[in-house]
Amino acid sequence: MGKRILPQRMGRGTPTFRSPSHRRVGPAKYPPLKLDRTIKGKIIDLLHDPGRWVPLAKIVLEDGTTFLTPAVEGMYVGQIIEIGPDAHISNGNILPIGKIPEGTQIANIEKRPGDGGKFVRSSGTYALIVGRAGTKTQVQLPSGKIIEVPNNARATIGVIAGGGRDEKPLLKAGNAYHKWKVKAKKWPKVRGVAMNAVSHPHGGGSHQHVGKPSTVARETPPGRKVGHIAARRTGRRKG
């Protein structure tokens, strides 16, 4: 009899596969909407969050409200930022996207007003405002896709900090171990064909091969449900 394969163990949710969220600094999102006026805030700290690839800026507002937001390039401790419709077009300021000129680099964009920021939050990324369409603003994401968001959704002026993070080589497996230890990722990821037959349906044999169809049905039982699950097609496209 075989043993429980890796996907079955993952589903049980033991600490090995669970995200260490207790180490996180906190949620990074904008404070509640205050579109009727512009307020100022001060960056009191720049924090490293083990669960992110980007540093966080801790900001305290005039009314004492404190919040975290992904830092943009050029931010520094002690910097005064503005939040609101009349804020200047300056690095780190937060404005409704309808008030930002076309061609401006922006980040941490709200999908809906008040959701705290959903788009362009990864290190080194930015979006561009490319046009207007009534009550919507057209934004080009880092992928090249153009989306429309409401004019009163907020965004930060600038480029998310931490660009070039993945340019430094890991060099050794120990560095990769620590990289993924703080994430909800199991590392290393071993191929099924490299395992023994007892550990995976694709394992075993005198050479590495699947040995059976790699496409399985959606209703396949857990110990066999590996490979191409309910695939419509596999392989290279032809023609």
Swiss-Prot record:
Region described as Disordered: 1-28, 199-239
Amino acid composition bias (Basic residues), ranges on this chain: 225-239
Family annotation (SUPFAM superfamilies): Nucleic acid-binding proteins, Translation proteins SH3-like domain
Protein origin, superkingdom: Archaea
One BP annotation, GO: cytoplasmic translation
Keywords assigned by UniProt, alphabetized: Ribonucleoprotein, Ribosomal protein, RNA-binding, rRNA-binding
Keyword Ribosomal protein belongs to the record: yes
Single GO term (MF): structural constituent of ribosome
Transmembrane segments: none
InterPro entries in alphabetical order: NA-bd_OB-fold, Rib_uL2_dom2, Ribosomal_uL2, Ribosomal_uL2_arc_euk, Ribosomal_uL2_C, Ribosomal_uL2_dom3, Ribosomal_uL2_RNA-bd_dom, Translation_prot_SH3-like_sf
CC terms in the record's Gene Ontology section: cytosolic large ribosomal subunit
Subunit text: Part of the 50S ribosomal subunit. Forms a bridge to the 30S subunit in the 70S ribosome.
PANTHER family documented for this protein: LARGE RIBOSOMAL SUBUNIT PROTEIN UL2 (PTHR13691:SF16), RIBOSOMAL PROTEIN L2 (PTHR13691)
Entry function: One of the primary rRNA binding proteins. Required for association of the 30S and 50S subunits to form the 70S ribosome, for tRNA binding and peptide bond formation. It has been suggested to have peptidyltransferase activity; this is somewhat controversial. Makes several contacts with the 16S rRNA in the 70S ribosome.
Protein name as catalogued: Large ribosomal subunit protein uL2
Species name: Staphylothermus marinus (strain ATCC 43588 / DSM 3639 / JCM 9404 / F1)
Gene: rpl2
